[in-house]
Amino acid sequence: MSIRAEEISALIKQQIENYQSEIEVSDVGTVIQVGDGIARAHGLDNVMAGELVEFSNGVMGLAQNLEENNVGIIILGPYTEIREGDEVRRTGRIMQVPVGKELIGRVVNPLGQPVDGLGPINTTNTRPIESPAPGVMDRKSVHEPLQTGIKAIDALVPIGRGQRELIIGDRQTGKTAVALDTIINQKDEDMICIYVAIGQKESTVRNVVETLRKHGALDYTIVVTASASQPAPLLYLAPYAGVTMGEEFMYNGKHVLVVYDDLSKQAAAYRELSLLLRRPPGREAYPGDVFYLHSRLLERAAKLSDARGGGSLTALPFIETQAGDVSAYIPTNVISITDGQIFLQSDLFFSGVRPAIDAGTSVSRVGGSAQIKAMSKVSGTLRLDLASYRELEAFAQFGSDLDKATQAKLNRGARTVEVLKQGLHKPLRVEKQVIILYALTRGFLDDIPVVDITRFEEEFHAWLDSNATDLLSEIRTTKKLADDDKFAAAINGFKKVFVASE
């Protein structure tokens, strides 16, 4: 077979015409130091702050310090396989996490990867973990109540949808229990909940997940966990991953509750990273931008305007105090960022008052606008009455003679404390809260012995379910107080059948 010269020249011409002369340029650096979750790389001249970089073994990192001769990178995964001299390359992307309804009911790490052994999460939607908070004109005043199901909170320090309410207290004072009860109470409220566990023990997170599953709350909850065994970069990123997953729902007109348990551990992880990156330490060795760490996170909680869909994202950040010291650096920072705080006292907790909410120092800066009309009417003076009772109680311990008015205040105060006690994982519907608080504030409980108050309340709720369903549904639908006669008839009707202890 003869090959003609014309064919050969035509083929060569075609090859020349189709030749692609584009060169793929990728910015590559070299690892010069690695350890403790931090790497320093030389040669990434054009890398951006916060950009994702990829090491030669596939582990990702986040560029943080851009210095004259090197780049400080926090490593998002195991760093033991990374060696000095390894290649590290830019990706041109910032960090994103998967979002969407496919995550609901799952337990994921801060990178959005499932850790519950239930298989992959089939979602293609992602959002950047750092995004600007909604602007002033995109927001609306907080006006819808978020019912926690906890009498002491819904009556004394009400939380609204889109609010940021700090839960602060020493370790072992019931902070997590408050959050779990709130999540459990959202069952029929069309609310998506996100529980972010930062630096918790794996066993604790397991217990939380099982509690949520047992009460049917995992059907509308995402659990994001960065446990104590994880490297510091994941603890630092966990809250941002949680709020990003929540924002996807908020911008689609849904209502979201995000619990950060707890931000003290995130601040400690960020301090660790900052010191390893050789950033100058400030007060309590925290870096200078630790306020911005929390403010840019909590500002992303909002109640959106109707034009933006009317969705909301409510934040419940936790801060752990040392021996009740709320004047430390991180507690004062977060108190100044949030719209109020619920202060849990260890003294109250160990004396059997649970939830151990200190009415004197707890405050909600949204207040009555986050309560239904019925609740704001029955709980109007409750907080002041409770605070004055605490003062009188201390005074009465001296055993001096008390006048009738003071004695009456002490008696009412003792009953108030008993009514506000609540069992673990037993959230109460708002209409039942209204009726028992009405009975308390209008003096219907003054003749019930203090030791019987808790039993009276439990039996009263059961009696209401079978004998006063009309009253319950009226409060639920109108959100206003029914006629005094209806309340009196229901309360007196039950008092006739209630048997007080001797």
Swiss-Prot record:
Keywords assigned: ATP synthesis, ATP-binding, Cell membrane, CF(1), Hydrogen ion transport, Ion transport, Membrane, Nucleotide-binding, Translocase, Transport
EC number: 7.1.2.2
Site feature Required for activity, where: 362
Region (Disordered): 115-135
UniProt topology in membrane: Peripheral membrane protein
Superkingdom in the source lineage: Bacteria
Subcellular location: Cell membrane
InterPro entries: ATP_synth_asu-like_sf, ATP_synth_asu_C, ATP_synth_asu_C_sf, ATP_synth_F1_a_nt-bd_dom, ATP_synth_F1_asu, ATPase_a/bsu_AS, ATPase_F1/V1/A1_a/bsu_N, ATPase_F1/V1/A1_a/bsu_N_sf
Residues annotated for ATP binding in this entry: 169-176
GO MF terms held by the record: ADP binding; ATP binding; proton-transporting ATP synthase activity, rotational mechanism
Keyword Transport on entry: yes
Catalytic activity as recorded in UniProt: ATP + H2O + 4 H(+)(in) = ADP + phosphate + 5 H(+)(out)
Coiled coil stretches, renumbered: none
Protein's UniProt keywords contain Lipid biosynthesis: no
Protein family (similarity comment): Belongs to the ATPase alpha/beta chains family.
Free-text function comment from the UniProt entry: Produces ATP from ADP in the presence of a proton gradient across the membrane. The alpha chain is a regulatory subunit.
Quaternary structure and partners: F-type ATPases have 2 components, CF(1) - the catalytic core - and CF(0) - the membrane proton channel. CF(1) has five subunits: alpha(3), beta(3), gamma(1), delta(1), epsilon(1). CF(0) has three main subunits: a(1), b(2) and c(9-12). The alpha and beta chains form an alternating ring which encloses part of the gamma chain. CF(1) is attached to CF(0) by a central stalk formed by the gamma and epsilon chains, while a peripheral stalk is formed by the delta and b chains.
Record HAMAP family: ATP_synth_alpha_bact
Protein name according to UniProt: ATP synthase subunit alpha
Designated gene of the protein: atpA
